Each structure stands twice: as structure tokens, then as C-alpha cells.
């Protein structure tokens, strides 16, 4: 859950230093791009690249180079991986994939060059492999999505038996990379290197996935990256030495060590929970509320454009690792409820991050990424989201236009409408998968009680059910969190002692009962007066 956002300030010299670090991650072009890579795909044990256009080189040949996520330019390199074959107005390349070896090209992006003055000069756009799923050995399809069940919850494994009682089809669980890399006991060899993951964490995750699957729930893993001395190489270098102490950090794919460890970890998860005896995971969310970078995905104090481009590289590594094992897995980015609003510094508006991320993905090859977002009430403690909280009216934070500052359950359609634009469509031409990976309402605090919480869940779910582009919601949470209760938030369907609140029974029945008895809390007699069922 997002915390209180504090406005960040920094000195000019510090900003320049961070920008310098990030600029090293941007691709460098030494010539005009007169060649366009149209396709980059796996076929058998080869990577095939097809390009159009032409460029003048010293020898009339075209040379293909592979760049790892942590590499930014061809520079002085001479190790091209293929020579192009012009045919019928196009240029074709073929180079080995080297799957599951130290030379693997699974995470490479490719660029066409020509010889000039003894160097190889890029003359094309860059493109990653577009179909990593071509080598997948499994496919864990979502049963709940197929049946139209949108109900999910941020689960708590001691109460796993309640998932089927609630009728939820999705269960969310958070996975912290640092916890798995600290300690060992479970070995995994990937691309020629052996990694040892914390046996206790792995076995606990085995148990959680199996328990949730046994309750007929699809599992959604939220991947986060905390700091520890043993995993400092997985933390974005721009976030180190800043004196900040966020909950989670941006993943480091700017160095070989960081990128390879992240790829191996995501491969490990996707391979392990791929429908075998250890269970299956259908969805992965890469990072939590990444636009709230200062708290949840810290990369340093950098402009949003640089942040979004770097996040796209992290996502691409995770996506290719996951899809190369599980062709049916859904992989999501994650933003909070702030759309245009930001608190300055490294706290960005969600729309700006989405725009920058999408631009970078389109630049380097469109893939089937999805969006998860968190349309909480404004503020978080104001559970009756259908009203404006005292003192918030003059701020005008919520409206039903693309210029809204915040997204709540009342204007979720702003997001789904935005994603129907041509530039945001999936490679298939359809609207991308959109989910809500966190949403909750407190039963305590000013103006709140257990009936208000129950009404908020009923109303918000009916709005979600009426939106055909939202595939699922994870309500947060199953149980009141004692720490959050001290902060004035009691979002659980159960209280901290495990006793059901009215919200429990409402969520249990919300997809099969009118629940009109809760409509008066929002100012109507029946939900049909709001056009809802």
C-alpha cells in the first residue's frame, strides 16, 4: 500500500550526477536510422531478424550486433553476430539463440550496422526478441479469467482455506528478491551459472502456491526488490549512497551481475511454478507502485523519462524470463492511484510513467505487457469514495477526464479508455490486460465503520464488474494488519483476531447477490439507480 508521500528536493549538482548515470543507459546512434528492423523472433534454435531500408557502407554489407540490457552502444566492438542477406527489398539475418548457455541471446536487443572508417556504425532502430514464449515448455492459463471471475484478494496463507469460501479466483502474494538471494540451499543453474536460493523462502513459497492452487485460485506474484548488503548489486546504482531509505528499490539491469541475477531469479520462479507438482503461477507484477519511486521502486532523483526507460529494460528482462518458460503467463507493470498528480522529486504521476514506458517498449519492439493499478480512495482513509473527503474539495483531485489528478473506483474508466488508443494496443490489436492488484477500504477512522467498508467493497466491485477491460481485482487484505491499524487503516475482511467483518460476507456474495441493502450508504435505494447490477 502506498504510504504518505513527502515532497522531495535535491540540489542541482546531485540531479546532474543522477542524470549522468542514467544517460549512460540510453542507446547511442552514430548515424541516421535509414534501416528499420521490422521483426525479431525466435525460430527453432535461431534468432531471425528482418529489416527494411538501406544504408551506404564501405563494403555494401549489413552487420547485426547484439546488445545486452546493460550495454548501450556498439562502440568499438567488432564481434557482429550475423551478416545480412538482402532480398526483395529487405535484409534478413539469422544468428544462434544459444538458449540456456552463457552466450544466450534471450535478453539481447539487436541493431543493424554498416562499416565506416573501420568501425561498425548503427543505422537502424534496436529490437528485442518479440516471442520469447516460442521456447516455453509450459502454459498456465487462467481458469478464473476464462470463467469471468474477477474476484481476488491479497491472501494470507494461514487463512488459505477461506479463498474458496469467498469464491475468489485470484490470490496475490509478494516476493522479495533479497530474501531469496540471502542464504542458499536450493541450487538453480541458468545460462551457465549456478545460483543458490534461500531454501526456507523457496519452500515457504512452494507451500503458499500449492495452498492457493488447491483453493482453485490463480496466483499473482508481486515482485519487489529490497536492499541488503548481500544483494546490493541488484539495486539500481542511482539509488545507492543517497541517504534515502525506501521500502523497495529499482532493479539493477545496468550491470552484467545485476541483470544476470535478476534474469536467473525470474527464470527460476517461472520454471518452478509452471504447472508441475509445485503448482502454477499465472500472473507476475514487476514492482509495486513504481511511479511512487521514492517509496516503492527507488532509482534515485531522476527525470521521469529516464526512470520509465530504465524500468522498461527491467521489465523486458522479467518478461522474457517468464514467457520463455510459461507462454500463457500475464506480466504487468504497476502504478498507484496518482494519474497526473505527483509530489515532486522521484514521485511521478502514473500517466507519465506509463507513457514513457510504452514509448520505450514500442521503440524496442512491442510485446504483450499489461497494466496493474491501485485506484484507492482519496485519501486512503476515506472509505466512502463516492463522496469528497472533508478539506479535499478545493483540490479538485478527481474528475472523469484524462486530466484527472487521481484515479479512484469512480473514474477507473479514465485508465481503461486511455488504453484503447492505438498506440497502447497489444501486438494483437486488442486492449491490453488491465488488472487492479491492490484496492482496499478501512473500517476505522473518521467517517468510517464496518458498514461503510462493506458498502465500499460492494460499490467498487460492481463498478469493476461493469468495466469489460478490467480482468481482476485483488482486494487488500484478508486480515487487518496490526501495523496499519496503528496508522488508522483496517482494510481486512477479517479483524486482527480473525473474525469476519460485514465486508467478508459482502465480498463472498458480491458476484451473485444484489446486496441492495448497502446501496443506501451511497445515497441510492438500489444499485440499478446507478446503472449497476
What label would you give each PLM region?
Residues 262, 277-282, 306-447:
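Noncatalytic carbohydrate-binding groove/subsite architecture in carbohydrate-active enzymes
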Residues 31-139:
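Beta-strand-enriched, solvent-exposed domains that form extended recognition/catalytic surfaces
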Residues 242-244, 274, 290, 295, ...:
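Aromatic-rich peripheral "rim/lid" segments of glycoside hydrolase catalytic domains that contact
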Residues 4-14:
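Bacterial N-terminal signal peptides that target proteins for export
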Residues 24-32:
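Sec-dependent signal peptide cleavage junction
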Residues 70-78, 82, 91, 113-271, ...:
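N-terminal substrate-binding region of glycoside hydrolase catalytic domains
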Residues 14-25:
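Bacterial N-terminal signal peptides
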Residues 150-152, 169-172, 216-220, 281-285, ...:
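Structural preference for beta-strand elements that scaffold enzyme active sites
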Amino acid at each position: 500500500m502506498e504510504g504518505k508521500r513527502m515532497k522531495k528536493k535535491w540540489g542541482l549538482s546531485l540531479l546532474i550526477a543522477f542524470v549522468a548515470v542514467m544517460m549512460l543507459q540510453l542507446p547511442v546512434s552514430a548515424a541516421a536510422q535509414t534501416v528499420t528492423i521490422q521483426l525479431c523472433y525466435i525460430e527453432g534454435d535461431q534468432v531471425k531478424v528482418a529489416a527494411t531500408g538501406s544504408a551506404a557502407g564501405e563494403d555494401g554489407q549489413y552487420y547485426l550486433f547484439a546488445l545486452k540490457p546493460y550495454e548501450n552502444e556498439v562502440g568499438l566492438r567488432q564481434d557482429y553476430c550475423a551478416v545480412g542477406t538482402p532480398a526483395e527489398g529487405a535484409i534478413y539475418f539469422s544468428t544462434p539463440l544459444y538458449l540456456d548457455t552463457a552466450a544466450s541471446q534471450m535478453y539481447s536487443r539487436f541493431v543493424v550496422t554498416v562499416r565506416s572508417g573501420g568501425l561498425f556504425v548503427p543505422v537502424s532502430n534496436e529490437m528485442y526478441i518479440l516471442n520469447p514464449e516460442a521456447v516455453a515448455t509450459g502454459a498456465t492459463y487462467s481458469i478464473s479469467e476464462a470463467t469471468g471471475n474477477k474476484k481476488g484478494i491479497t491472501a494470507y496463507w494461514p487463512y488459505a482455506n477461506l479463498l474458496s469460501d469467498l469464491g475468489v479466483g485470484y490470490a496475490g502474494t509478494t516476493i522479495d528478491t533479497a530474501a531469496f538471494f540471502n542464504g542458499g540451499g536450493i541450487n538453480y543453474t541458468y545460462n551457465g551459472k549456478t545460483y543458490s536460493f534461500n531454501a526456507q523462502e523457496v519452500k515457504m513459497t512452494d507451500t503458499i502456491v500449492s495452498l492457493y492452487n488447491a483453493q482453485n485460485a490463480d496466483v499473482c506474484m508481486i515482485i519487489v526488490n529490497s536492499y541488503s548488503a548481500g544483494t546490493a548489486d541488484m539495486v539500481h546504482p542511482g539509488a545507492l549512497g543517497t541517504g534515502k531509505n525506501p521500502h523497495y528499490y529499482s532493479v539493477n539491469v545496468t550491470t552484467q551481475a545485476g541483470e544476470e541475477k535478476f534474469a536467473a531469479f525470474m527464470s527460476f520462479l517461472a520454471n518452478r511454478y509452471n504447472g508441475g507438482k509445485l503448482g502454477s503461477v499465472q500472473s507476475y507484477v514487476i514492482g509495486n507502485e513504481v511511479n511512487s519511486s521514492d517509496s516503492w521502486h527507488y532509482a534515485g532523483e531522476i527525470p521521469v523519462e529516464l526512470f520509465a526507460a530504465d524500468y522498461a529494460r527491467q521489465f523486458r528482462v522479467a518478461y522474457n524470463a517468464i514467457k520463455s518458460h510459461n507462454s500463457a503467463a500475464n506480466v504487468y507493470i504497476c502504478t498507484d492511484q496518482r494519474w497526473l498528480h505527483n509530489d515532486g522529486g522521484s514521485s511521478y504521476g502514473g500517466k507519465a510513467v506509463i507513457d514513457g514506458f510504452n514509448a520505450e517498449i514500442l521503440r524496442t519492439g512491442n510485446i504483450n505487457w499489461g497494466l496493474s493499478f491501485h485506484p484507492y480512495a482519496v485519501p486512503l482513509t476515506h472509505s466512502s469514495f463516492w463522496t469528497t473527503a472533508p478539506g479535499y474539495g478545493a483540490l479538485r483531485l478527481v474528475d472523469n477526464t484524462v486530466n484527472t489528478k487521481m484515479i479512484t473506483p469512480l473514474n477507473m474508466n479514465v485508465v481503461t479508455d486511455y488504453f484503447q488508443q492505438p498506440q497502447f494496443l497489444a501486438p494483437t490489436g486488442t486492449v491490453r490486460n488491465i488488472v487492479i492488484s491492490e484496492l482496499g477500504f478501512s473500517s476505522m477512522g473518521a467517517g468510517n465503520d464496518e458498514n461503510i467498508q462493506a458498502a465500499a467493497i460492494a460499490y467498487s466491485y460492481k463498478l469493476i464488474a461493469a468495466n469489460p477491460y478490467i480482468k481482476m481485482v485483488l482486494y487488500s487484505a484478508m486480515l487487518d494488519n496490526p501495523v496499519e491499524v496503528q496508522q488508522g487503516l483496517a482494510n481486512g475482511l477479517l479483524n486482527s483476531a480473525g473474525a469476519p467483518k460485514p465486508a467478508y460476507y459482502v465480498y463472498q456474495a458480491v458476484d451473485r447477490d444484489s446486496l441492495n441493502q448497502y446501496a443506501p450508504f451511497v445515497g441510492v435505494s438500489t444499485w440499478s439507480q446507478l446503472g449497476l447490477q
